[in-house]
A protein has these predicted regions:
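Bacterial N-terminal signal peptides
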Residues: 30-49
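Flexible, glycine-rich surface segments
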Residues: 261-377, 385-386
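Surface-exposed patches in mature extracellular/periplasmic domains of secreted proteins
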Residues: 127-136, 197-203, 262-267, 293-296, ...
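C-terminal soluble interaction/assembly domains
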Residues: 328-450
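Acidic helix-start/capping segments at beta-turn-to-alpha-helix junctions
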Residues: 130-156, 205-209, 218-226, 328-335
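Acidic/His-rich structured neighborhood in mature extracellular/periplasmic domains
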Residues: 156-308
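N-terminal secretory signal peptides that target proteins for export/translocation
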Residues: 1-33
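An acidic, Gly/Ser/Thr/Pro-rich helix-cap/linker signature
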Residues: 54-182, 188-191
Length: 450
Protein backbone atom coordinates (compact mmCIF):
# COMPACT_ATOMS: atom_id res chain seq x y z
CA UNK A 1 0.00 0.00 0.00
CA UNK A 2 1.46 3.33 -1.01
CA UNK A 3 0.76 6.53 0.85
CA UNK A 4 1.63 10.06 -0.21
CA UNK A 5 3.13 12.16 2.57
CA UNK A 6 2.00 15.81 2.49
CA UNK A 7 4.76 18.18 1.43
CA UNK A 8 3.65 21.18 3.46
CA UNK A 9 2.10 21.87 6.81
CA UNK A 10 -1.61 22.72 6.87
CA UNK A 11 -2.09 26.33 5.88
CA UNK A 12 -4.15 26.97 9.03
CA UNK A 13 -2.35 26.06 12.28
CA UNK A 14 -4.39 23.54 14.28
CA UNK A 15 -4.85 23.52 18.02
CA UNK A 16 -3.14 20.66 19.81
CA UNK A 17 -6.50 19.06 20.63
CA UNK A 18 -7.84 19.22 17.05
CA UNK A 19 -5.83 16.33 15.67
CA UNK A 20 -7.33 13.32 17.39
CA UNK A 21 -10.54 12.74 15.45
CA UNK A 22 -9.04 10.89 12.51
CA UNK A 23 -9.05 7.08 12.71
CA UNK A 24 -5.61 5.52 12.99
CA UNK A 25 -4.34 3.03 10.44
CA UNK A 26 -4.54 -0.68 11.35
CA UNK A 27 -1.60 -1.69 13.50
CA UNK A 28 -0.76 -4.66 11.30
CA UNK A 29 0.02 -2.57 8.25
CA UNK A 30 3.48 -1.42 7.24
CA UNK A 31 3.84 1.28 4.61
CA UNK A 32 6.51 2.39 2.21
CA UNK A 33 6.35 6.09 1.38
CA UNK A 34 7.71 6.64 -2.10
CA UNK A 35 9.27 9.94 -3.24
CA UNK A 36 11.58 11.29 -5.91
CA UNK A 37 14.84 11.99 -4.13
CA UNK A 38 14.89 15.68 -5.02
CA UNK A 39 11.54 16.18 -3.32
CA UNK A 40 12.82 14.37 -0.23
CA UNK A 41 15.77 16.76 0.04
CA UNK A 42 18.49 14.43 -1.08
CA UNK A 43 17.93 12.57 2.20
CA UNK A 44 21.27 13.44 3.68
CA UNK A 45 23.68 15.36 1.56
CA UNK A 46 21.81 18.53 2.33
CA UNK A 47 20.48 17.95 5.87
CA UNK A 48 22.58 19.57 8.56
CA UNK A 49 25.11 20.09 5.82
CA UNK A 50 25.85 16.39 5.71
CA UNK A 51 29.43 16.36 6.82
CA UNK A 52 30.01 13.17 4.85
CA UNK A 53 33.62 13.87 4.05
CA UNK A 54 34.49 14.02 7.74
CA UNK A 55 34.93 10.64 9.38
CA UNK A 56 34.41 11.82 12.95
CA UNK A 57 30.84 11.49 14.30
CA UNK A 58 29.53 14.91 15.20
CA UNK A 59 28.53 13.66 18.62
CA UNK A 60 32.06 12.72 19.59
CA UNK A 61 34.91 13.85 17.38
CA UNK A 62 37.98 11.79 18.19
CA UNK A 63 41.20 13.74 18.47
CA UNK A 64 43.76 12.71 15.92
CA UNK A 65 47.25 11.78 17.07
CA UNK A 66 49.51 14.68 16.06
CA UNK A 67 52.40 13.84 13.80
CA UNK A 68 55.81 13.88 15.44
CA UNK A 69 58.11 16.80 14.79
CA UNK A 70 61.01 18.54 16.45
CA UNK A 71 58.79 21.49 17.33
CA UNK A 72 56.15 19.34 18.98
CA UNK A 73 57.69 19.55 22.45
CA UNK A 74 57.21 23.31 22.38
CA UNK A 75 53.45 23.04 21.89
CA UNK A 76 51.46 22.72 25.09
CA UNK A 77 47.74 23.37 24.51
CA UNK A 78 45.66 25.13 27.11
CA UNK A 79 42.99 22.90 28.71
CA UNK A 80 39.51 23.73 27.49
CA UNK A 81 36.04 22.50 28.47
CA UNK A 82 34.63 19.90 26.11
CA UNK A 83 31.78 21.12 23.87
CA UNK A 84 28.35 19.55 24.04
CA UNK A 85 27.60 16.65 21.65
CA UNK A 86 26.07 17.67 18.35
CA UNK A 87 23.97 15.69 15.85
CA UNK A 88 25.86 13.12 13.81
CA UNK A 89 26.78 13.71 10.17
CA UNK A 90 24.22 12.44 7.71
CA UNK A 91 24.84 9.62 5.21
CA UNK A 92 24.35 10.45 1.56
CA UNK A 93 21.89 9.20 -1.03
CA UNK A 94 22.62 9.52 -4.73
CA UNK A 95 20.59 11.90 -6.86
CA UNK A 96 18.19 10.43 -9.37
CA UNK A 97 17.12 7.51 -7.17
CA UNK A 98 13.61 6.92 -5.91
CA UNK A 99 13.53 7.08 -2.13
CA UNK A 100 11.18 4.98 -0.03
CA UNK A 101 10.39 5.61 3.61
CA UNK A 102 9.30 2.51 5.47
CA UNK A 103 6.98 3.11 8.41
CA UNK A 104 5.06 0.95 10.87
CA UNK A 105 1.84 2.60 12.10
CA UNK A 106 0.62 2.39 15.72
CA UNK A 107 3.94 1.12 17.05
CA UNK A 108 3.66 3.50 19.99
CA UNK A 109 0.10 2.81 21.11
CA UNK A 110 -0.03 1.05 24.51
CA UNK A 111 3.73 1.34 24.87
CA UNK A 112 5.20 1.36 28.39
CA UNK A 113 8.06 3.70 27.48
CA UNK A 114 5.66 6.12 25.84
CA UNK A 115 3.34 5.94 28.85
CA UNK A 116 6.21 6.97 31.14
CA UNK A 117 7.15 9.80 28.77
CA UNK A 118 3.56 11.04 28.70
CA UNK A 119 3.37 11.01 32.49
CA UNK A 120 6.51 13.14 32.59
CA UNK A 121 5.11 15.60 30.04
CA UNK A 122 1.91 15.92 32.07
CA UNK A 123 3.83 16.53 35.30
CA UNK A 124 6.38 19.00 33.94
CA UNK A 125 4.58 20.74 31.09
CA UNK A 126 0.89 20.45 32.01
CA UNK A 127 -0.12 18.39 28.98
CA UNK A 128 -3.40 16.50 28.82
CA UNK A 129 -2.63 12.79 29.19
CA UNK A 130 -5.54 11.61 27.05
CA UNK A 131 -4.57 13.98 24.25
CA UNK A 132 -0.98 12.71 24.25
CA UNK A 133 -2.09 9.06 24.29
CA UNK A 134 -4.32 9.79 21.30
CA UNK A 135 -1.45 11.56 19.56
CA UNK A 136 1.10 8.77 20.04
CA UNK A 137 -1.45 6.19 18.88
CA UNK A 138 -1.09 7.87 15.49
CA UNK A 139 2.71 8.02 15.48
CA UNK A 140 4.52 5.68 13.10
CA UNK A 141 7.88 4.02 13.56
CA UNK A 142 10.22 5.24 10.80
CA UNK A 143 12.45 2.34 9.87
CA UNK A 144 14.09 4.63 7.33
CA UNK A 145 15.14 7.17 9.96
CA UNK A 146 16.53 4.37 12.11
CA UNK A 147 18.56 3.04 9.18
CA UNK A 148 19.89 6.43 8.16
CA UNK A 149 21.36 7.24 11.59
CA UNK A 150 23.37 4.02 11.60
CA UNK A 151 27.11 4.63 11.19
CA UNK A 152 28.66 3.49 7.92
CA UNK A 153 30.28 0.02 8.05
CA UNK A 154 33.62 1.65 7.29
CA UNK A 155 34.45 5.34 7.64
CA UNK A 156 34.61 7.36 4.45
CA UNK A 157 37.93 8.80 3.37
CA UNK A 158 37.99 12.51 4.16
CA UNK A 159 38.33 14.60 1.01
CA UNK A 160 38.25 18.35 1.46
CA UNK A 161 38.36 19.24 -2.24
CA UNK A 162 35.37 17.04 -3.04
CA UNK A 163 33.43 18.42 -0.09
CA UNK A 164 34.35 22.00 -0.99
CA UNK A 165 33.23 21.59 -4.58
CA UNK A 166 29.90 20.16 -3.45
CA UNK A 167 29.01 23.21 -1.36
CA UNK A 168 30.69 25.96 -3.38
CA UNK A 169 29.03 25.03 -6.66
CA UNK A 170 27.36 27.51 -9.01
CA UNK A 171 23.87 26.44 -7.93
CA UNK A 172 24.45 27.46 -4.33
CA UNK A 173 26.37 30.62 -5.18
CA UNK A 174 23.71 31.86 -7.60
CA UNK A 175 20.91 30.93 -5.21
CA UNK A 176 22.81 32.76 -2.47
CA UNK A 177 22.99 35.93 -4.54
CA UNK A 178 19.25 35.73 -5.18
CA UNK A 179 18.55 35.12 -1.48
CA UNK A 180 20.78 38.02 -0.42
CA UNK A 181 19.16 40.41 -2.91
CA UNK A 182 15.68 39.44 -1.70
CA UNK A 183 16.58 39.80 1.97
CA UNK A 184 19.24 42.51 1.97
CA UNK A 185 17.45 44.71 4.51
CA UNK A 186 16.76 41.82 6.88
CA UNK A 187 20.33 40.55 6.64
CA UNK A 188 21.70 43.99 7.43
CA UNK A 189 19.31 44.39 10.35
CA UNK A 190 20.37 41.03 11.78
CA UNK A 191 24.03 41.91 11.30
CA UNK A 192 23.56 45.18 13.17
CA UNK A 193 21.55 43.60 15.99
CA UNK A 194 23.53 40.39 16.51
CA UNK A 195 26.95 41.33 15.16
CA UNK A 196 27.07 38.47 12.64
CA UNK A 197 28.03 39.41 9.04
CA UNK A 198 25.37 38.80 6.36
CA UNK A 199 27.72 36.51 4.43
CA UNK A 200 28.01 34.11 7.37
CA UNK A 201 24.22 33.85 7.69
CA UNK A 202 23.97 33.36 3.92
CA UNK A 203 26.69 30.70 4.04
CA UNK A 204 24.94 28.63 6.71
CA UNK A 205 21.53 28.71 5.06
CA UNK A 206 23.07 27.86 1.69
CA UNK A 207 24.95 24.85 3.01
CA UNK A 208 22.01 23.64 5.08
CA UNK A 209 19.12 23.71 2.60
CA UNK A 210 20.14 25.76 -0.48
CA UNK A 211 18.06 28.63 0.92
CA UNK A 212 15.01 26.54 1.76
CA UNK A 213 15.00 24.41 -1.36
CA UNK A 214 15.51 21.11 0.52
CA UNK A 215 14.05 21.15 4.03
CA UNK A 216 12.95 17.53 4.39
CA UNK A 217 9.77 15.49 4.01
CA UNK A 218 10.00 13.24 7.05
CA UNK A 219 7.21 13.70 9.55
CA UNK A 220 9.14 15.19 12.46
CA UNK A 221 7.00 13.57 15.15
CA UNK A 222 7.62 10.11 13.66
CA UNK A 223 11.36 10.66 13.29
CA UNK A 224 11.88 12.03 16.80
CA UNK A 225 9.75 9.36 18.47
CA UNK A 226 11.56 6.61 16.59
CA UNK A 227 15.00 7.90 17.53
CA UNK A 228 13.99 8.70 21.11
CA UNK A 229 12.65 5.23 21.87
CA UNK A 230 13.97 2.89 19.17
CA UNK A 231 17.44 4.18 18.34
CA UNK A 232 19.57 1.48 16.68
CA UNK A 233 21.89 -0.60 18.83
CA UNK A 234 25.09 1.45 18.56
CA UNK A 235 27.76 2.17 21.20
CA UNK A 236 26.35 5.66 21.82
CA UNK A 237 22.71 4.57 21.85
CA UNK A 238 21.86 5.77 25.36
CA UNK A 239 23.29 9.25 24.79
CA UNK A 240 21.62 9.60 21.41
CA UNK A 241 18.24 8.45 22.71
CA UNK A 242 18.49 10.99 25.53
CA UNK A 243 19.23 13.74 22.99
CA UNK A 244 16.26 12.83 20.82
CA UNK A 245 13.97 12.40 23.82
CA UNK A 246 14.80 15.97 24.86
CA UNK A 247 14.11 17.16 21.32
CA UNK A 248 10.80 15.27 21.25
CA UNK A 249 9.85 16.96 24.52
CA UNK A 250 10.78 20.38 23.14
CA UNK A 251 8.98 19.63 19.87
CA UNK A 252 5.70 18.93 21.66
CA UNK A 253 6.01 22.04 23.83
CA UNK A 254 6.91 24.21 20.82
CA UNK A 255 4.06 22.97 18.61
CA UNK A 256 1.55 23.33 21.44
CA UNK A 257 2.66 26.84 22.34
CA UNK A 258 2.76 27.85 18.64
CA UNK A 259 -0.65 26.26 17.93
CA UNK A 260 0.85 23.97 15.30
CA UNK A 261 -0.39 20.51 14.43
CA UNK A 262 2.52 18.27 15.56
CA UNK A 263 1.62 15.68 12.92
CA UNK A 264 1.96 18.25 10.13
CA UNK A 265 5.52 19.46 10.74
CA UNK A 266 8.03 18.05 8.25
CA UNK A 267 11.81 18.02 8.39
CA UNK A 268 14.92 15.89 8.20
CA UNK A 269 15.10 12.30 9.42
CA UNK A 270 16.86 13.54 12.57
CA UNK A 271 14.07 16.01 13.33
CA UNK A 272 15.72 19.21 12.05
CA UNK A 273 13.18 21.73 10.80
CA UNK A 274 13.03 24.52 8.30
CA UNK A 275 15.30 26.76 6.26
CA UNK A 276 18.12 26.72 8.85
CA UNK A 277 17.50 23.08 9.94
CA UNK A 278 17.04 23.76 13.66
CA UNK A 279 16.37 20.86 16.00
CA UNK A 280 13.37 21.53 18.27
CA UNK A 281 15.59 22.23 21.28
CA UNK A 282 17.37 24.92 19.26
CA UNK A 283 14.04 26.31 18.10
CA UNK A 284 12.97 26.80 21.71
CA UNK A 285 16.33 28.22 22.80
CA UNK A 286 17.43 30.34 19.84
CA UNK A 287 14.70 30.84 17.22
CA UNK A 288 13.23 34.34 16.98
CA UNK A 289 10.20 35.95 15.39
CA UNK A 290 12.05 38.27 13.03
CA UNK A 291 9.23 39.24 10.70
CA UNK A 292 7.11 40.54 13.59
CA UNK A 293 3.99 38.50 12.87
CA UNK A 294 3.76 37.06 16.37
CA UNK A 295 5.00 33.52 15.77
CA UNK A 296 8.12 31.70 14.61
CA UNK A 297 7.96 29.84 11.29
CA UNK A 298 11.33 28.53 10.15
CA UNK A 299 9.89 26.77 7.11
CA UNK A 300 8.07 29.68 5.48
CA UNK A 301 9.64 32.85 6.89
CA UNK A 302 13.06 33.74 5.52
CA UNK A 303 13.22 36.60 8.01
CA UNK A 304 12.67 34.25 10.95
CA UNK A 305 15.38 31.95 9.58
CA UNK A 306 17.86 34.83 9.19
CA UNK A 307 17.24 36.22 12.67
CA UNK A 308 17.36 32.77 14.25
CA UNK A 309 20.70 31.85 12.66
CA UNK A 310 22.20 35.17 13.73
CA UNK A 311 20.91 34.76 17.28
CA UNK A 312 22.21 31.19 17.48
CA UNK A 313 25.71 32.29 16.50
CA UNK A 314 25.68 35.26 18.86
CA UNK A 315 24.54 33.12 21.78
CA UNK A 316 27.34 30.64 21.06
CA UNK A 317 30.01 33.32 21.32
CA UNK A 318 30.36 35.02 17.92
CA UNK A 319 32.90 37.85 18.14
CA UNK A 320 31.81 40.85 16.08
CA UNK A 321 34.43 42.12 13.64
CA UNK A 322 36.86 39.28 14.26
CA UNK A 323 38.22 36.87 11.59
CA UNK A 324 37.09 33.30 11.10
CA UNK A 325 40.39 31.81 9.90
CA UNK A 326 43.98 32.85 9.21
CA UNK A 327 46.11 31.44 6.42
CA UNK A 328 49.39 29.67 7.18
CA UNK A 329 52.52 30.24 5.09
CA UNK A 330 53.27 27.36 2.68
CA UNK A 331 56.91 26.84 3.72
CA UNK A 332 57.94 23.43 5.03
CA UNK A 333 58.57 24.64 8.57
CA UNK A 334 55.17 26.25 8.97
CA UNK A 335 53.40 23.24 7.51
CA UNK A 336 55.31 20.92 9.84
CA UNK A 337 54.28 22.89 12.92
CA UNK A 338 50.67 22.90 11.71
CA UNK A 339 50.75 19.15 11.19
CA UNK A 340 52.11 18.60 14.69
CA UNK A 341 49.49 20.84 16.29
CA UNK A 342 46.49 19.54 14.31
CA UNK A 343 44.74 17.44 16.95
CA UNK A 344 41.15 17.61 15.70
CA UNK A 345 39.87 19.78 18.54
CA UNK A 346 37.60 22.57 17.24
CA UNK A 347 37.83 24.89 20.24
CA UNK A 348 40.76 27.35 20.18
CA UNK A 349 43.33 25.85 22.55
CA UNK A 350 46.72 26.96 21.20
CA UNK A 351 48.04 30.43 21.92
CA UNK A 352 49.25 31.99 18.67
CA UNK A 353 52.61 32.89 20.20
CA UNK A 354 53.25 29.20 20.99
CA UNK A 355 52.90 28.27 17.35
CA UNK A 356 54.99 31.22 16.21
CA UNK A 357 57.80 30.28 18.59
CA UNK A 358 57.70 26.74 17.21
CA UNK A 359 58.33 28.10 13.72
CA UNK A 360 54.90 28.69 12.20
CA UNK A 361 54.54 31.77 9.98
CA UNK A 362 51.22 33.40 9.14
CA UNK A 363 50.35 34.31 5.56
CA UNK A 364 48.34 37.33 6.69
CA UNK A 365 50.18 40.59 5.90
CA UNK A 366 47.51 42.76 7.54
CA UNK A 367 47.59 40.95 10.90
CA UNK A 368 49.42 42.75 13.70
CA UNK A 369 51.36 39.85 15.20
CA UNK A 370 52.28 41.70 18.37
CA UNK A 371 48.69 42.55 19.24
CA UNK A 372 47.45 39.06 18.33
CA UNK A 373 50.18 37.09 20.14
CA UNK A 374 47.84 35.94 22.91
CA UNK A 375 44.97 35.02 20.58
CA UNK A 376 43.78 31.42 21.06
CA UNK A 377 43.53 29.38 17.85
CA UNK A 378 43.04 25.84 16.65
CA UNK A 379 44.75 24.18 13.68
CA UNK A 380 42.26 23.17 10.99
CA UNK A 381 43.41 20.23 8.88
CA UNK A 382 41.87 19.73 5.43
CA UNK A 383 43.04 16.41 3.97
CA UNK A 384 42.54 15.45 0.33
CA UNK A 385 43.78 12.06 -0.94
CA UNK A 386 46.71 12.42 -3.31
CA UNK A 387 47.47 15.99 -2.21
CA UNK A 388 49.31 17.59 0.67
CA UNK A 389 46.98 18.30 3.58
CA UNK A 390 45.96 21.95 3.78
CA UNK A 391 46.06 23.75 7.12
CA UNK A 392 44.50 26.95 8.46
CA UNK A 393 44.25 28.55 11.87
CA UNK A 394 40.71 28.74 13.21
CA UNK A 395 39.76 31.49 15.64
CA UNK A 396 36.81 31.80 18.01
CA UNK A 397 34.38 32.49 15.18
CA UNK A 398 35.48 29.31 13.40
CA UNK A 399 34.73 27.40 16.59
CA UNK A 400 31.28 29.02 16.76
CA UNK A 401 30.53 27.70 13.26
CA UNK A 402 31.41 24.19 14.44
CA UNK A 403 28.79 24.58 17.16
CA UNK A 404 26.22 24.56 14.35
CA UNK A 405 27.77 21.38 12.96
CA UNK A 406 30.86 19.86 14.57
CA UNK A 407 32.91 19.50 11.41
CA UNK A 408 35.96 21.40 10.16
CA UNK A 409 34.81 20.84 6.59
CA UNK A 410 31.35 22.22 7.35
CA UNK A 411 32.61 25.34 9.10
CA UNK A 412 35.06 26.26 6.36
CA UNK A 413 32.53 25.52 3.60
CA UNK A 414 30.04 27.87 5.30
CA UNK A 415 32.66 30.60 5.53
CA UNK A 416 33.87 30.20 1.95
CA UNK A 417 30.37 29.97 0.45
CA UNK A 418 29.41 33.19 2.20
CA UNK A 419 32.55 34.92 0.93
CA UNK A 420 31.92 33.66 -2.61
CA UNK A 421 28.35 34.97 -2.59
CA UNK A 422 29.50 38.30 -1.15
CA UNK A 423 32.13 38.64 -3.88
CA UNK A 424 29.47 38.13 -6.56
CA UNK A 425 27.19 40.66 -4.88
CA UNK A 426 30.00 43.22 -4.94
CA UNK A 427 30.99 42.39 -8.51
CA UNK A 428 27.42 42.99 -9.66
CA UNK A 429 27.25 46.32 -7.87
CA UNK A 430 24.56 45.10 -5.48
CA UNK A 431 26.86 45.49 -2.50
CA UNK A 432 29.52 48.08 -1.79
CA UNK A 433 32.72 46.77 -0.18
CA UNK A 434 33.13 48.08 3.34
CA UNK A 435 36.05 50.46 4.02
CA UNK A 436 37.62 47.82 6.25
CA UNK A 437 37.54 45.22 3.46
CA UNK A 438 39.03 47.63 0.97
CA UNK A 439 41.79 48.70 3.37
CA UNK A 440 42.82 45.24 4.51
CA UNK A 441 42.31 43.35 1.28
CA UNK A 442 40.19 40.84 3.17
CA UNK A 443 38.63 37.90 1.31
CA UNK A 444 35.33 39.77 1.23
CA UNK A 445 36.34 41.29 -2.08
CA UNK A 446 37.85 38.09 -3.41
CA UNK A 447 36.53 34.52 -3.69
CA UNK A 448 38.28 32.14 -1.28
CA UNK A 449 41.19 30.25 -2.74
CA UNK A 450 40.67 26.71 -3.82
Amino acid sequence: MSVILPRNRPSRPLRFDMIFHQPAAPASLAFRLRFPLAALSLAATLFASAAVAQTQPAAAVVAQEPAQSQSQSQLQPQPQPQPQPQPQPQPSVQQGQTFEEEIIPQRYANNAKIDAFIADMVARHDFDANALHALFARVSYSATAAKLVMPAPSPAVKNWRVYQSRFLDAVRVNAGVKFWRANQGTLQRASTEFGVPPEVIVGIIGVETIYGRYMGNFRTLDALTTLAFDYPNTPNRDARQATFRKNLEDFLVWTRDSQLDPTGVLGSYTGAVGIPQFLPSSIRDYAVDYDGNGHIDLRASQADAIGSVANYLKQHGWETGRPVVWNIAPDTGSQGVAQAAADGRPEPHWVLSQLLRAGLVLDEPSVNIASEASTPVTVVDLPTPGRATEYKLGLQNFYVLTRYNRSFFYALAVYQLGERVKAQMEASGALTPSPADAATGSPAAQPPSE
